[in-house]
Amino acid sequence: TRWRDQDMDWAIAVNRKQGVYADPERKSELTALNQHARALTEAWNEGLSKALPLTVYYDVNRAVLDVPMRVREKLADSPDEAYLDALDPGGADFKRFFIWFRNLEDQENEFRRDDPLHRKPELEAVREAIASLTGFSELRVRRNPLRMTLSKAGQELNVQQLSDGERTLLALVGDMARRLSMLNRVPSKRQGPGVVLIDEIDLHLHPRWQRDVVAKLENTFPQCQFILSTHSPQVLGELPPEAVKVLGDGQLRPAPGRTLGLSSSEVLEEIMEGPSRNTAVAQALHTLEHAMEDGDYPQARRHLAALRSQVGDIPEVLRLEEQLAWLDPAMEDEA
């Protein structure tokens, strides 16, 4: 591990207690890591450190099922809270984000009675991050009835009215900004360093959002490194090949020669090795082209009519119809 130009060697080994296959040569070596962790903690406690690194993992179970507005809980404002459950399986605890936001907004509203322009930097970091990634604004808690709302395209909505993809991304971004705000003493809380792992970044997202979600994450949290998994051609088509690792059967496959700028169908065929078109339709198109190449134009016309009745005027059908009309004068006579 390398942190602030310092190399650290460490390892964690887990042997079954009194296990038959316990390996005495395998043991944890955490001395260097523990020493560095203590140094970071001391620097933070003494006010010498302005930022601590975030490490957090969001798995595929991060879907937000409910917004627990009526839960009352006092949360600590410390680095310990920022790291709580950050690497646990089962998804980040988004409940804590909503509770944290409501508690801080209560404090902000108290100060605004005397100073209407007062804003909590921690909440501003969340609002800025959400606006940057989703375009939503004015995230707030309404009291009567109790609900969390935001502005989408100028319309105030309850967050429960958002799609699953919108709500999941909102909570993920809010949780990241919350954690970073507790680990940074700089004015711009979103500028903190970190390593963020997100499984299936395209989870529930509309294909249009999949296209730019990675770029928006990098712009919103510029000092964070993102390690993402995806099965989305839209996501892969927005990344340079050096940023892509292809896994198959638990093995690292050869790096792709190109990804950025490819269409979704090209990504499916070249990177994912899958068909970009329905197999039956692809076979019908091949049969039509084969008849045209053989000069069997009557048969080609029958294939064309059958295919059109099945799929309509898709671009490939129109292209082959135009070619057939040029090759077979009989089509123009019939027209």
Language model segments and positions:
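Switch/communication elements of ASCE P-loop NTPase nucleotide-binding domains
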Residues: 143, 147-276
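Non-catalytic, well-ordered alpha-helical scaffold segments
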Residues: 52-55, 81, 124, 167-170, ...
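Short, polar/flexible loop-turn hinges at active-site or ligand-entry regions and domain interfaces
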Residues: 65, 70-72, 111-112, 274-277
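P-loop NTPase switch/coupling surface
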Residues: 1-95, 287, 292, 312-335
